[in-house]
Amino acid sequence: MKYLHTMVRVTDLDATINFFQTLGLNELRRFDSEGGRFTLVFLAAPGDEDAQVELTYNWDPEELDGGRNFGHLAYAVDDIYTLCQKLMDAGITINRPPHDGRMAFVRSPDGVSVELLQKGDALPAADPWQDMANTGEW
């Protein structure tokens, strides 16, 4: 058995791709189904192409309800402070800042929770992160 991907339905494909690319993921492939009226986009972190996120975009408008049965996606990152600053500079809210130099949470445009974990040991606590308040749900 081999893990293939996690599928996430999205309502704004371009905004969601931009979000994940800002996180550092690359688009691997895309499939448009005229008959099924949907688009699939597969993304992965560089060097970790086996752990893919599949974005499913249905062309006909639909309302998506966020189920609590789906928790979050998680990625190990080289420098949590640098990535969180990059995300903030791109207008992405850091819902749970890396107070401890170890963990942060953000949400995609459709509200999918993404956990960011510092590779190895936590970084030393630093400003502005250690005093930054949590925002919304994560």
Where do the PLM segments sit?
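Short, charged/polar surface micro-motifs in flexible loops or helix N-caps
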Residues: P46-D50, D60-E62, I80
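Eukaryotic phosphotyrosine signaling hubs
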Residues: Y3-H5, R68-H72
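Vicinal oxygen chelate
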Residues: R30-D32, T39-V41, Y75, Y81-W138
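Core segments of cupin and vicinal oxygen chelate
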Residues: M1, M7-D50
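Short, low-complexity disordered segments enriched in Ser/Pro/Gly and basic
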Residues: E63-G67
